[in-house]
From Swiss-Prot:
Cited InterPro entries: AICAR_Tfase_dup_dom_sf, Cytidine_deaminase-like, MGS-like_dom, MGS-like_dom_sf, PurH-like
Protein name as annotated: Bifunctional purine biosynthesis protein PurH
Keyword match Heme: no
Annotated GO MF terms: IMP cyclohydrolase activity; phosphoribosylaminoimidazolecarboxamide formyltransferase activity
Protein EC: 2.1.2.3, 3.5.4.10
CDD domains the UniProt entry points to: IMPCH
Length: 530
């Protein structure tokens, strides 16, 4: 039988006071004596709850503007004392056992995120007593419960009610894990912040920002699900998410129906969703093996889907489909009646769409919510023995960023298609070539070791599906090192090219475009994707 420990005395000291008053009232109603500090003690006292200030309990006042409050043997002895084994020494020094510690920490992350935050501001929001109590209680979880999340308050009360005001060892252990996760994340944030600073005391400075990248990199992710396997069936895998996953992301999406998401499902769905976010008009992106195989905009979602599917129906089989508008019934019905699909994701899903997809119970239907402007963050790539960290590729060009380098000027229709095509190319594996016309991909050449072969493949794809390349535009994710890619595009019927430029042979490539009567624009921005 599990060893349950009664809760008779609790120490409450929280920065985030969400739900703490209700929790304290519930503890008091169950006969738990309350110890507290500072603002938490005042909140409880003002609500009429019987609470003992830690300074009264220890006989030692808070000092140094609150820097020293709970760092006292009567506090930590009460938390760390092993029941039965340390009872005599605790009695000798008048140390009362503390059975539960309820603590969350100074808002360091919120403080350093504020505009104009100084190093001094950050330093004063480094919690010392809080993490010490959390770690003490977590270490002694055999006898003490540690609660660091407001989400656990109700759970604790329910178990106390069903267990004679006691908590089981399994619960205390689970709470201890959460506590160590909490302090690890907290210390990681502080280390990341300080790791970007170079102390330059003496020039009326307290620190200079040296780099976006700290000396050591600390980041915490929370396991969202275990998976049957990873990229391949012999690889174990799990999916982890940021604690505050961005709205409108795969990590924050809700699965409405279908089988459990696989490792490859999640990777491909992320690729599709991030691509479709680039478009303002109703858009559809179909992805296979992390590459867009069909992308289109339309007057509505149904027309966007029909045109995206038309690009490459063969590759669309078993693909991932993403939309940037609410999924409606007509579009959902067209998908499930036409093709086998692994995942459909949209910001919202209408009831009619849910009903239509329900006919295919294995289809994974996800609702990701509305997204906001993308926040700068980091992307990671694991290498053997190390980690590559870079800023997310949020770059995108507008018409004002483009430079016409050819003799021929693009038409307005070509300009619109060039921007559409460039948005797609950003999400195609390098070397990436995309053909497009009238807001629809015509052919996609992805992942080839030479750029000219990507161009040839895009043309072959279009021909195989009976699509007309003549009059289409082409986007290349990086510069053309030779003119051969332009010659191949011209032979296929491409009229206009958008590319970053920057090759030693740019003039040779521009001359090729002029020879073929094509127009060419430089973006001065590359979009490699590996």
């Amino acid at each position: 039988m599990e060893q349950a420990r009664p809760i008779r005395r609790a120490l409450l000291s929280v920065s985030d006071k969400t739900g703490i008053l209700e929790f304290a009232k519930a503890l008091n109603e169950r006969g738990v004596a309350l110890l507290s500090t500072g603002g938490t003690a005042k909140l409880l006292a003002d609500a009429g709850l019987p609470v003992t200030e830690v300074s009264d309990y220890t006989g030692f006042p808070e000092m140094m503007d609150g820097r020293v409050k709970t760092l006292h043997p009567k506090v930590h002895g009460g938390i760390l004392g092993r029941r039965e084994q340390d009872d005599a020494i605790m009695a000798q020094h008048a140390i009362s056992p503390i059975d539960m510690v309820v603590v969350n920490l100074y808002p360091f992350a919120a403080t350093v995120a504020k505009p104009g935050c100084t190093l001094a501001d950050a330093v004063e929001n480094i919690d010392i007593g809080g993490p010490t109590m959390v770690r003490s209680a977590a270490k002694n979880h055999k006898d003490v419960a540690i609660v660091v999340k407001a989400a656990d308050y109700d759970r604790v009360i329910r178990e106390m009610d069903g267990n004679g005001n006691s908590l089981k060892l399994a619960t205390r252990f689970d709470l201890a894990i959460a506590a160590f996760e909490h302090t690890a994340a907290y210390d990681g944030m502080i280390a990341n912040y300080f790791g970007t600073m170079v102390p330059s005391y003496g020039d009326n400075k307290e620190g200079d920002e040296e780099s976006r990248f700290p000396r050591t990199f600390n980041s915490q992710f929370i396991k969202k699900q275990d998976m049957r396997y990873g990229e391949n069936s012999h690889q174990a895998a799990a999916f982890y998410a940021e604690e505050q996953a961005a709205p409108g992301s795969v990590a924050s999406a809700i699965q409405l129906q279908g089988k459990a998401l696989s490792y490859n499902n999640i990777a491909d769905t992320d690729a599709a969703l991030e691509c479709v976010k680039e478009f303002d008009q109703p858009a559809c992106v179909i992805v296979k093996h992390a590459n867009p195989c069909g992308v289109a905009i339309g007057s509505d979602l149904l027309s966007a889907y029909e045109r995206a599917w038309q690009t490459d129906p063969t590759s669309a089989f078993g693909g991932i489909i993403a939309f940037n508008r609410e999924l409606d019934g007509a579009t959902a019905k067209a998908i499930v009646e036409r093709q086998f699909v692994e995942v459909i994701i949209a910001p919202t899903v209408s009831q009619a769409a849910r009903d239509a997809v329900a006919a295919k119970q294995n289809v994974r239907l996800l609702e990701c919510g509305q997204w906001t402007a993308p926040a700068q963050g980091f992307d990671f790539k694991r290498v053997n023995g190390g980690l590559l960290v870079q800023e997310r590729d949020l770059g995108m060009v507008t018409l004002g960023d483009l430079t016409v380098v050819s003799k021929r000027q693009p038409t307005e229709a070509e300009l619109n298609d060039l921007l559409f095509c460039w948005k797609v190319a950003k999400f195609v594996k390098s070397n990436a070539i995309v053909y497009a016309k009238d807001g629809q991909t015509i052919g996609v050449g992805a992942g080839q070791m030479s750029r000219v072969y990507s161009a040839k493949i895009a043309g072959i794809k279009a021909e195989d599906e009976g699509l007309t390349v003549a009059g289409s535009v082409m986007a290349s994710d990086a510069f053309f090192p030779f003119r051969d890619g332009i010659d191949a595009a011209a032979a296929a019927g491409i009229s206009c090219v958008i590319q970053p430029g920057g090759s030693m042979r740019d003039q040779e490539v521009i001359d090729a475009a002029d020879e073929h009567g094509m127009c060419m624009l430089f973006t001065n921005m590359r979009h490699f994707r590996h």
